[in-house]
Amino acid sequence: MKIAVIGTGIAGNVAAYHLNKHHEITVFEANDYVGGHTHTHTVEGAGGPHAVDSGFIVFNYATYPQFTGLLAELGVEAQLSEMSFGVRCDTTGLEYMGSSLNTLFAQRRNLLRPSFWGMIGDILRFNRTAGELLADAENNITLGDYLAEQGYGEAFIHHYLIPMAAAVWSADHQLMEQFPARYLLQFFHNHGLLKVADRPDWYVIKGGSKVYAEALTRAHREHIRLSTPVLAVRREASRVIVTSAAGDETFDALFVACHSDQALALLEDPSETERAVLGAICYQDNEVLLHTDSSLMPRRRRAWAAWNYHLQDTVAGAGPVAVTYNMNILQGFDCDQQYCVTLNNSAAIDPHQVIARMHYQHPVYTPESVAAQGRQAEINGPMRTYYCGAYWRYGFHEDGVVSALDALEHFERSQGDRER
């Protein structure tokens, strides 16, 4: 069969990897590189060039079984990373990093702050009582309402939980307050974030994340068209017509592996179900800068973490998410030059130290979007179209792989139905 795949993020690449074994595929990619959020930059510096990741960075073997199985199949090596989280608040001067008592109290006056001790108490209570909400499968309360209902303190909310969750999902404070609380707790539970100790080890791809993307696409690289955005998609009873700058091309089936909002915009003939499901899952744009300006890190070196959340205004967490990833810590670069990746806080970065500037889009999670995720099967198959992407679950690499495997399963089932 002739099959089109739109997008070379993790979902599109996994779908194409498997489809290429038995079908004639054409992969359309709007960017000038393969990978989507898998984005590695080769930076010349002291000690030789460094492959610095700016999108997908870390994974673990406990909660990424499909992705790590794929890495093993491809022979891609991983290296141990150091995962830690810290907060810097310009309004209050607060700085801490949560990996040890020394770093938790990197700012020694935190020992005398009742609000800081209250935050620690709330962290322990939140972790201890999470099971109650997890056991209530029908509870759709938002995170903001849940925190208010349970009486958590402002320090815990604005200096710990919302910054951590906002950093995980690249979402601003207002969006995080609308996040389904049980959905967040399920993710935290799965990733060991409700425990102070015994959390899973995290890893990065040795040589940068592009190494796995290159291995995954090696067999079908000649079928990938870079800088070729799809302009429109029209479905007919016996074929799918994909329009790009090259004109109209006809295929027997289509795998749509771009974002949900992009997918819906491409369809000339969306069904009511496609409108309802894809339209319920929105995205937020984030500006991302790769740079060497270490002034974005906490002022105290003891408080430097792998993930550093920057609170510039404590008034309901005003402004977009602002987090700096220290890539020396995450990717193990042994050099004096600090390589950082910062979301959104571009005005604070010395422009002379900027290496690259990107925009990535991330899913927005609400009770409505989570409900729509449960309807993936309703739109996978009709009109010869199959949807995959990390947005069908939590938005991470494992989710992209699982969504592609789900779409492939629907595809195989549809072929069996047509043959009967």
Predicted regions: what they are:
Residues 99, 316-420:
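Conserved flavin/dinucleotide-binding core of flavoenzymes
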Residues 20-44:
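Glycine-rich FAD pyrophosphate-binding loop
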Residues 2-27:
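N-terminal Rossmann-like FAD-binding beta1-loop-alpha1 element of flavoenzymes
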Residues 184-244, 249:
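Helical element adjacent to the flavin cofactor pocket in flavoenzyme catalytic cores
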Residues 41-67:
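N-terminal glycine-rich dinucleotide-binding loop that anchors FAD/FMN and/or NAD(P) in oxidoreductases
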